[in-house]
């Protein structure tokens, strides 16, 4: 059945023509119902809406008359009572309302709209004030009215002393004067005196001066002292002035509240505003939260993952452990170098656990206000108890967990220590809970308070170290899943794991991402091994500076410097395998030699001496070929490495026969007094100097023996800029000390195609071994 009702907005000429042609002349409807009136603008007020209603009525009456509608077609206009007054800004509005029959047909829908209010909006939000022209004008009007009402001088006219004397005092119209607040005189005229303003006042500088002038003026007028104009003195408190005096304070308080609300809103946690500053900023995750990281995404830290999974299993099924009398540890600290996966493990725990997971940073407990830290700790654990069983993760706990009393020589740590004390109480105090587990992450477990590490609080300390070659291979496989690689992922991961000794999980993720970016930059459809190798160089050595042009003299010096490193490393026994030598500037370095260190946890005396000799080989080569007068500053970084190794050799490893097996701290910045005598310090300095000198002379002797081979390496570098292990082997011959842990020749043969595609490396025939000098 067709709907017999027509809904339209406020009538226009086009609307009237349509009604007359389609309905009125055909006698197809009997009445018009104006259900609602809207202005569809920001100036929507009751006055404008009722004005629109009147306009609509007049328009319909004019429509019926002007269109020549017969008397029998006179149509009554029925005005509905469904009007709503709103000051809320409306952009779209509504097109009218249905008739009674249509309303009965859609009764439930209309009821819902009534509950929501006008236009379906929430009635609680109807009276939001919009910042527009009417609002500003209304505010100015209200301020003006308040000023007139509250200001005592608002209805008074200010005059000068001359006006006062000529118009009032000389004519004898002044009944009395009132000195207000010692700076203003109010003129009270005699009764019956007609004046334009009614009341007048003038300002004075001082009361004594005013009294003298008034007395002199009255004497000049011949007024006897007994008939002088009486003067009264009193103080008045202006309501407006009082309010204005509080205005700066109120403005500051309002600004603080506004900024705190914005800050809390941006943080997305805790109660808004300054009144919620003691609330915890922890974010809660549960099984309904979209966390995509799972334990399957964490690789290379199998032992730590197993420890964490044990906590999760206990919270999921505590009865399995309790039947054996076991108690879950209260907490665990995840420690290790940056980028090893501490926070990633916590994210995986949040993604796997079916219990609530609260995550917070240690720095979020500390604010500029006293007492905020302990309050947030209490609120954090109160939230955890409400959601028990629950897991709490505090990242960078060393921000609040440093040992008490440290660093207090130059300032107070009361607030941080109070926060730490509250954390200790919450973890193992009278109100502690057995179903709350606390995880914490830190890079510096050595600075934490012993009370925090004792059993009953953080029972377990899980150290997450840099992954070994097997761990790196697993991590590469995880990240290579999302990359379109040219070769088999397992083969790529195995090779890259060998090339990235000492890399953390974050470094490996960066290498994979950089490799994909390099492939995209070169318009490649797939990521090849050469792209990953370039990414490793990008991460370890820095960005290649092709725009940095060296002079021929500088380039020759850099080539001989890097050739010295390569030759020394080739003929020294305990040196890491050489992969590549380059004189292309990268980052702050003008050249570099790339080595392949193995996973090693102990260093012998011979290894330290060989490492020192190889680091000094660059300076030694410059001295051999250019003389002592032309050595450069390019070896400054090498000297720093050598000095650190020599200091550790003498003061930490106990390898110096003179100093003996005694450990001395070299870094004494945190202490005022050195823990050893001046004689001991002098002996340490002398031993370090002797050790470095011995390494220098030993390296110089080695390079002089292979001077011709060094020169050949330098010339090849000047020709090609980059040479690899196989080319060095072609020039210098087989290495005297074979690498036992891997086959370098086979490893480098897998990437020989790289040199074939590099325009800097044209193919060259192998040359016979050069005779040694």
Swiss-Prot record:
InterPro entries: AAA+_ATPase, AAA_lid_3, ATP-dep_Zn_Metalloprotease, ATPase_AAA_core, ATPase_AAA_CS, FtsH, P-loop_NTPase, Pept_M41_FtsH_extracell
Stored PROSITE patterns: AAA (PS00674)
This protein's UniProt keywords: ATP-binding, Hydrolase, Membrane, Metal-binding, Metalloprotease, Mitochondrion, Nucleotide-binding, Protease, Transmembrane, Transmembrane helix, Zinc
UniProt region (Disordered), positions on chain: 83-119, 752-773
GO biological process: mitochondrial protein processing; mitochondrial protein quality control
Superkingdom as given in the UniProt entry: Eukaryota
Gene Ontology molecular-function annotations: ATP binding; ATP hydrolysis activity; ATP-dependent peptidase activity; metalloendopeptidase activity; zinc ion binding
Low complexity bias spans: 87-101
Binding-site residues, Zn(2+): 561, 565, 638
SMART domains, A to Z: AAA
Membrane topology, record value: Multi-pass membrane protein
Segments of skewed composition (Pro residues): 761-773
Localisation: Mitochondrion membrane
Active site: 562
Cofactor info, note text: Binds 1 zinc ion per subunit.
Sites where the protein binds ATP: 298-299, 340-344, 479
UniProt similarity note: In the N-terminal section; belongs to the AAA ATPase family. In the C-terminal section; belongs to the peptidase M41 family.
NCBIfam families: FtsH_fam
Function per UniProt: Catalytic component of the m-AAA protease, a protease that plays a key role in proteostasis of inner mitochondrial membrane proteins. Possesses both ATPase and protease activities: the ATPase activity is required to unfold substrates, threading them into the internal proteolytic cavity for hydrolysis into small peptide fragments. The complex is necessary for the assembly of mitochondrial respiratory chain and ATPase complexes. The m-AAA protease carries out protein quality control in the inner membrane of the mitochondria by mediating degradation of mistranslated or misfolded polypeptides.
Assembly mode: Component of the m-AAA protease complex.
Protein name: Mitochondrial inner membrane m-AAA protease component yta12
Source organism (scientific name): Schizosaccharomyces pombe (strain 972 / ATCC 24843) (Fission yeast)
Source species taxonomy: Eukaryota, Fungi, Dikarya, Ascomycota, Taphrinomycotina
GN (gene name): yta12
